[in-house]
Amino acid sequence: MLAKRIIPCLDVRDGQVMKGVQFRNHEIIGDIVPLAKRYADEGADELVFYDITASSDGRVVDKSWVARVAEVIDIPFCVAGGIRSIDDAAKILSFGADKISINSPALADPTLITRLADRFGVQCIVVGIDTWFDDATGKYHVNQYTGNENRTRVTQWETLDWVQEVQQRGAGEIVLNMMNQDGVRNGYDLTQLKKVRDVCRVPLIASGGAGTMEHFLEAFRDADVDGALAASVFHKQIINIGELKAYLAGQGVEIRIC
């Protein structure tokens, strides 16, 4: 059995780490490189960086900080933000990233997933899915351009359909960003995770809602996700990664202990 992964998420805007609630009202957390090093030192399995306004602004993630992060950490990291071409991805990988993640650009051009997977291998290609539960319809829908409140829109895709589509096109991993739960710290949406797990054959990463160590345990034990991504509980030092891993190991979760 592969070890479960603990993955801090760093949302980046204008060279700094930000954090919002339900993808709104972002506050500044701090500088990118010191936070990345802190999480690596605490025992994170990997890091994810989202340049949250790159896609909506029509630009590619700023690559200067990618190189600086690669210099100070020795764990894998994934970068996302406005990647629309093989050339965009190649440059980010050449600066030291281990994976690239695409979200809104994949919705605009689903063939991008296949082209990137064919060029770099599926193990390198992550697809992020921003999913919102609509109380009126009782369905989960995929959103696009969520880094900009003024441009966020609901797409025609229901979440489960898009999960299956991106796998067919070559996604090697899926990060499910559950927008309703984002930043509120009352637990992952286990109902949605279980539904996605049933149709997801590639590694599945839960994102949105972690507030306690028990929430991580529930995601691993009840929804069988491969990794759990979180931001505010780590940024605000509510949970220490080393202590979290010790707790999970004590509960029987296969986890890498530093």
UniProtKB/Swiss-Prot annotation:
It catalyses: 5-[(5-phospho-1-deoxy-D-ribulos-1-ylimino)methylamino]-1-(5-phospho-beta-D-ribosyl)imidazole-4-carboxamide + L-glutamine = D-erythro-1-(imidazol-4-yl)glycerol 3-phosphate + 5-amino-1-(5-phospho-beta-D-ribosyl)imidazole-4-carboxamide + L-glutamate + H(+). It is an enzyme of class 4 (lyase). Its EC number is 4.3.2.10. It is found in: Cytoplasm. Pathway: Amino-acid biosynthesis; L-histidine biosynthesis; L-histidine from 5-phospho-alpha-D-ribose 1-diphosphate: step 5/9. It comes from the Bacteria. One of its GO terms (cellular component) is cytoplasm. The active site is at 11, 130. GO terms for biological process: L-histidine biosynthetic process. Keywords: Amino-acid biosynthesis, Cytoplasm, Histidine biosynthesis, Lyase. IGPS catalyzes the conversion of PRFAR and glutamine to IGP, AICAR and glutamate. The HisF subunit catalyzes the cyclization activity that produces IGP and AICAR from PRFAR using the ammonia provided by the HisH subunit. Heterodimer of HisH and HisF. This is Imidazole glycerol phosphate synthase subunit HisF. It comes from Salmonella choleraesuis (strain SC-B67). The lineage of its organism: Bacteria, Pseudomonadati, Pseudomonadota, Gammaproteobacteria, Enterobacterales.
